[in-house]
């Protein structure tokens, strides 16, 4: 790992539009980033790798089990709802209980945003996998949106694993890469990210340093 990784958990508030310095409309997603707290620091000596664990979101302490209660007490922080670990070579620079906010990022940097996509329910192959479908005419009978063949008959005599078929669509962990942070509002703890990010409004998102690109 060559570069330091920064990250923060937050809540997707929704989309809006702002104007840049050239008076062009820029669609942005507003993310309420943090505040997160550092609950664990992993080092090469004790764990074999370097990483920092951050926590986010309020939770009723009565809903936290005993192992997690002890984990949060060791870091001297109140229990949080979500935990995530970021592997980064500068993990030793973090301290237990340290607060991580939107200020870890600057405007103009590239980030990857991870969230849980919207659930679409049971969907066919045309919606779920972008299949073309069968012909609208020329003798096609009531099979216009079907997948077509899903395998041979006697050879191989089965359906291969991974065959794209109808099924539940969405509600999966999705990462959108190389998005640009348009602006940072440190006072309100907001990140304005150019473009769309996965998930519904109010959903949990992880904003971290881009894995690819500059």
Swiss-Prot record:
GO cellular component terms attached to this protein's record: cytosolic large ribosomal subunit
Protein name as annotated: Large ribosomal subunit protein uL3
SUPFAM superfamilies in the record: Translation proteins
Signal peptide stretch: none
Pfam families, per the entry: Ribosomal_L3
Region (Disordered): 133-153
HAMAP family: Ribosomal_uL3_B
UniProt keyword annotation of Cell inner membrane present: no
Assembly behavior: Part of the 50S ribosomal subunit. Forms a cluster with proteins L14 and L19.
